Amino acid sequence: MKIYIIDNGGQWTHREWRTVRDLGVDSTIVPNTVDADVLADADGIILSGGPASIESEISKLGNIKEYMHRYNYPVLGICVGAQFIAIDSGGRVSKALHAEYGKKIVNFTSKDGIFYNIPDSINAWENHNDEIKSISDDYIICAYSDTCRVQAFYHKNRDIFGVQFHPEVNNTEHGTTIFKNFIEKCRR
């Protein structure tokens, strides 16, 4: 099994790689500009977080649109990766009313997809200035916080998932469980 971590310039991309590796899966970090042919053997991809502001810097996200649409593997978007999925679906992302950095309580309304075996509420690590305001009806919004309406979502028919928070950071409770559940989707 092989999972590629698409590097969007996030400070914790190596944590995502290490978490997947520590769960026993071959993983490789690649820049978001790599040719999509490199991902032909992928069983899944993770779109890392990054410093890009979607509104003004979407070009810094390289080829991730092609990576999502060329192959039919599971996709997990983290932070700016999730924001890209929302925009790609026809949703909207813009500046958050309050930039977030630190722990936040995230409440789950549904635990389907990769969000099973997680409590109804977790402490999660946040680090974002932009946030998802809306997403296409093809997706289910399954988690929120008191300041961010879209903390997690999943596609109704495909294995595409997104989280605004950072499950790879130790301060996020049950973050490893989210990665384990994603890996299980990649095994199918």
Swiss-Prot record:
Enzyme class: ligase
Active site, UniProt feature: C79 (nucleophile), H166, E168
A GO cellular-component term linked to this record: cytosol
Domain Glutamine amidotransferase type-1: 2-188
Keywords of this entry: ATP-binding, Glutamine amidotransferase, GMP biosynthesis, Ligase, Nucleotide-binding, Purine biosynthesis
Database matches in InterPro entries: Class_I_gatase-like (IPR029062), GATASE (IPR017926), GMP_synth_GATase (IPR004739), GMP_synthase_A (IPR023686)
Keyword field contains Amino-acid biosynthesis: no
EC number(s) reported in the record: 6.3.5.2
One GO MF term: GMP synthase activity
PROSITE patterns on file: GATASE_TYPE_1
Domain of life: Archaea
Catalyzed reactions per annotation: XMP + L-glutamine + ATP + H2O = GMP + L-glutamate + AMP + diphosphate + 2 H(+)
Pathway(s) per entry: Purine metabolism; GMP biosynthesis; GMP from XMP (L-Gln route): step 1/1
Subunit structure, interactors included: Heterodimer composed of a glutamine amidotransferase subunit (A) and a GMP-binding subunit (B).
Functional summary from the UniProt entry: Catalyzes the synthesis of GMP from XMP.
NCBIfam families: guaA_Nterm, PRK00758.1
Protein name as it appears in the record: GMP synthase [glutamine-hydrolyzing] subunit A
